[in-house]
Amino acid sequence: MLEGYRGKALEFLSSHNVDVGDLIELQKDGLSIKGVVMPSYSKEDDIIVIKLDNGYNIGVSISGISNFKLVEKKRQNIQVNKGEQKPLKEKSEVKIISTGGTIVSKVEYETGAVRPALTTEEIINFMPEINEIAKIDAEVLFSILSENMKPEYWIKIAESAKKALDEGNLGVVIAHGTDTMAYTASALAFSFKSLTGPIVLVGSQRSSDRPSSDSPINLYSAILVAKNSPFAEVTINMHGESSDTYTLVHRGVKVRKMHTSRRDAFQSINDIPLAKVFWKEKEIKLLRNDYIKRKEENALDAKFDTRVFLLKYYPGINPEIIEYLISSGIRGIIVEGTGLGHTSTEFVDYFKKATKDGVFIGMTSQCLFGRVNMNVYTTGRLLQESGVTPLEDMLPETALVKLMWVLAHESDLDKIRSLMLTNFVGEINYRHVPEYFPRWFHDGIRLQ
């Protein structure tokens, strides 16, 4: 099956009896190219995608190809069953729960497909050094792109993590796509009232078939943290710099993906990470001592009301959107306001009506760094008088997930406000220091 191919490329490959996963060799522009045919996602209909021996994919136009040869056909039908896992002969210390993403996926070169590593043995083969630090067990809970994550899946992840910890695992590693990982981390953090061990979310910015992949180091250090760290919090463990020296363990409610593709994309905001992990030395260096310690039991309370909305203010936005949201049944709105927490004064009357109808309005800042302070300017004071609740230094995404959790437990508006301002798991930092703000590079660089 020539997945993704159409037009000229489909006709060309079909005429040579080539399928995805077949090994081919060709000559083009004086170069000899040999590799495995991969599925195509190209907008052009004359491109063949080939995986080279070095792990990289290239696109080759069929125009000008000479001496095309099918070297070897290899086709296997692979079925991935959700929840499939292989029983362990001995009790595990760390449970790995896969939800999707590239972190524990591998390329099946016989078919050209990317599939999750299903068994404990496959993960050990992925990075044999894991055997040196922990006994692991692995499970595929589901395999989805992180943009398809939903609150109902958060509950399933939380239940699976609790089960793993109740069974005696020292910690849990959750493999997750990076784009919405921070949302899931916040959801799990609010769902657990106590934990016997850490829940470590881990992902990969570079897929495992690429030489520059961050998958092995991120996974290895996440397992190290899950087993050996003294804290029992929901965290995110990702590269701390662009090289492979260390990873950083971020508190799940104070972290954000701040770059589309860098390996060190995840950064703690208005906070410092919990720990730095030097994976080669197998060392966890604690960066703070105010972490939540391991408890005697795992207490789970995972419920979410999805009738919420994240509203990003911009100049000229029509305040009538608030009326629409109220009429659609929304129970709470998190506003990403400007600066210290502002919208135009045109919103004041609409916010008054919303709060009168029992709708919670919470204010965060688009600046991300710093906290909202709605007592400085007249606009902020007017917004507060209309019923808007300033949410300290909470990240907008964290505030949104927290509101889902709060609304699932409370209906009284005053109590909702009180809960939103309660610092449950470190989502609010009352004291900021200059070190929390990144120092951007200000010296000149020469661009070639």
Swiss-Prot record:
InterPro entries: AsnA_fam, Asp/glu_Ase-like_sf, Asparaginase/glutaminase-like, Asparaginase/glutaminase_AS2, Asparaginase_C, GatD, GatD_N, GatD_N_sf. The active site is at T102, T178, D179, K257. This is Glutamyl-tRNA(Gln) amidotransferase subunit D. Its EC number is 6.3.5.-. Allows the formation of correctly charged Gln-tRNA(Gln) through the transamidation of misacylated Glu-tRNA(Gln) in organisms which lack glutaminyl-tRNA synthetase. The reaction takes place in the presence of glutamine and ATP through an activated gamma-phospho-Glu-tRNA(Gln). The GatDE system is specific for glutamate and does not act on aspartate. It comes from Sulfurisphaera tokodaii (strain DSM 16993 / JCM 10545 / NBRC 100140 / 7) (Sulfolobus tokodaii). Keywords: ATP-binding, Ligase, Nucleotide-binding, Protein biosynthesis. Residues 92-423 form the Asparaginase/glutaminase domain. The keyword Cell membrane does not apply. GO terms for molecular function: asparaginase activity; ATP binding; glutaminyl-tRNA synthase (glutamine-hydrolyzing) activity.
